[in-house]
Amino acid sequence: MTMTAFLARRLIGNGSSQILGTSSSSSGPFISVSRAFFSSSTPIKATLFPGDGIGPEIAESVKQVFTAADVVIDWDEQFVGTEVDPRTNSFLTWDNLQSVLKNKVGLKGPMATPIGKGHRSLNLTLRKELNLYANVRPCYSLPGYKTRYDDVDLITIRENTEGEYSGLEHQVVKGVVESLKIITRKASMRVAEYAFLYAKTHGRKKVSAIHKANIMQKTDGLFLQCCDEVAAKYPEIYYEKVVIDNCCMMLVKNPALFDVLVMPNLYGDIISDLCAGLVGGLGLTPSMNIGEDGIALAEAVHGSAPDIAGMNLANPTALLLSGVMMLRHLKLNKQAEQIHSAIINTIAEGKYRTADLGGSSTTTDFTKAICDHL
């Protein structure tokens, strides 16, 4: 595979069908949104959660890079509340949610849920209230940035609304607690359909359903049954079922064994971070949450890093690449490709890298270098 083709496959989307990126040289997984703009000169209204810790700094990097790339965007900045909103049972407010529902698209920096009882986590609230049913995380090697593996190119698709993360825990008796795992046919069919349609749309050859049905025969058994049913509709795509522990071993031994992985919530949380480690960490990994009614929320999945907050040391790559995914979703393919190439070239050159990438550049210098490549 040539370097041009190698990079093209990693560009996050390139088409304009119901799921973006229908050409063979793209990998854009996101459901299209019907919006009232058709050119790069029409302002886009998008929700922005700068987030906590380093969030505001890396959000500022995104703003600067988007401006340099002539992305005309009107950010609706949202900040979580200082008290629990009774309508959401979270520090995430009702107005925060309404912003995303209205704009249909958004970008989220890292959020830190305040410690304490009696309220839901911020991320869980977003997923539940906005029905963000699929988390799509491309995991690919960045040319010029050396890691333990070369040419990693896979996609994790995580069911995002149920499983062990249903919030159903209680104490049975003193010293004994119980947590309920919820798997439904509706949610499993929905994410399975998305995974196979994604694979077909983007020229992917294989879908792996990750499970532990050998032990959890009812819950994971239902998930697998749904994947089996959907797989039967796509005979051109190779389908396999892989036990979660074996999947972890296979990923570490040879990531090239996988293409598209679809899995329940908890497994997706774990496997997607494992895959990020194959290519350099969460600081290099973009992510997009897909919801019904055309909602898409891109996010940086790393932590808020309060220890370096305000020190101009943060790496904005993950949020920038997630922003690229958002632009692809909005069919702003030209600007998305320009920004993606500028990020890749900056990292590959090696002159300007933040400390986590082995360099000594500040957030400001790294961002400026990306803008200069534009």
From Swiss-Prot:
<dbReference type="GO" id="GO:0005739">
    <property type="term" value="C:mitochondrion"/>
</dbReference>
<feature type="site" description="Critical for catalysis">
    <location>
        <position position="212"/>
    </location>
</feature>
<keyword id="KW-0496">Mitochondrion</keyword>
<keyword id="KW-0464">Manganese</keyword>
<feature type="binding site">
    <location>
        <position position="273"/>
    </location>
    <ligand>
        <name>Mg(2+)</name>
    </ligand>
</feature>
<keyword id="KW-0560">Oxidoreductase</keyword>
<dbReference type="GO" id="GO:0000287">
    <property type="term" value="F:magnesium ion binding"/>
</dbReference>
<dbReference type="InterPro" id="IPR019818">
    <property type="entry name" value="IsoCit/isopropylmalate_DH_CS"/>
</dbReference>
<keyword id="KW-0460">Magnesium</keyword>
<protein>
    <recommendedName>
        <fullName>Isocitrate dehydrogenase [NAD] catalytic subunit 6, mitochondrial</fullName>
        <ecNumber>1.1.1.41</ecNumber>
    </recommendedName>
</protein>
<dbReference type="GO" id="GO:0051287">
    <property type="term" value="F:NAD binding"/>
</dbReference>
<comment type="function">
    <text>Catalytic subunit of the NAD(+)-dependent isocitrate dehydrogenase involved in the oxidative decarboxylation of isocitrate to 2-oxoglutarate. Performs an essential role in the oxidative function of the citric acid cycle.</text>
</comment>
<dbReference type="GO" id="GO:0006102">
    <property type="term" value="P:isocitrate metabolic process"/>
</dbReference>
<feature type="transit peptide" description="Mitochondrion">
    <location>
        <begin position="1"/>
        <end position="44"/>
    </location>
</feature>
<feature type="binding site">
    <location>
        <position position="245"/>
    </location>
    <ligand>
        <name>Mg(2+)</name>
    </ligand>
</feature>
<dbReference type="GO" id="GO:0006099">
    <property type="term" value="P:tricarboxylic acid cycle"/>
</dbReference>
<dbReference type="GO" id="GO:0004449">
    <property type="term" value="F:isocitrate dehydrogenase (NAD+) activity"/>
</dbReference>
<feature type="binding site">
    <location>
        <position position="127"/>
    </location>
    <ligand>
        <name>substrate</name>
    </ligand>
</feature>
<dbReference type="InterPro" id="IPR004434">
    <property type="entry name" value="Isocitrate_DH_NAD"/>
</dbReference>
<feature type="binding site">
    <location>
        <position position="245"/>
    </location>
    <ligand>
        <name>substrate</name>
    </ligand>
</feature>
<keyword id="KW-0809">Transit peptide</keyword>
<feature type="binding site">
    <location>
        <position position="137"/>
    </location>
    <ligand>
        <name>substrate</name>
    </ligand>
</feature>
<feature type="binding site">
    <location>
        <position position="158"/>
    </location>
    <ligand>
        <name>substrate</name>
    </ligand>
</feature>
<dbReference type="InterPro" id="IPR024084">
    <property type="entry name" value="IsoPropMal-DH-like_dom"/>
</dbReference>
<keyword id="KW-0520">NAD</keyword>
<feature type="binding site">
    <location>
        <position position="269"/>
    </location>
    <ligand>
        <name>Mg(2+)</name>
    </ligand>
</feature>
<dbReference type="Pfam" id="PF00180">
    <property type="entry name" value="Iso_dh"/>
</dbReference>
<dbReference type="GO" id="GO:0005829">
    <property type="term" value="C:cytosol"/>
</dbReference>
<keyword id="KW-0816">Tricarboxylic acid cycle</keyword>
<feature type="site" description="Critical for catalysis">
    <location>
        <position position="165"/>
    </location>
</feature>
<comment type="similarity">
    <text>Belongs to the isocitrate and isopropylmalate dehydrogenases family.</text>
</comment>
<comment type="subunit">
    <text>Heterooligomer of catalytic and regulatory subunits.</text>
</comment>
<keyword id="KW-0479">Metal-binding</keyword>
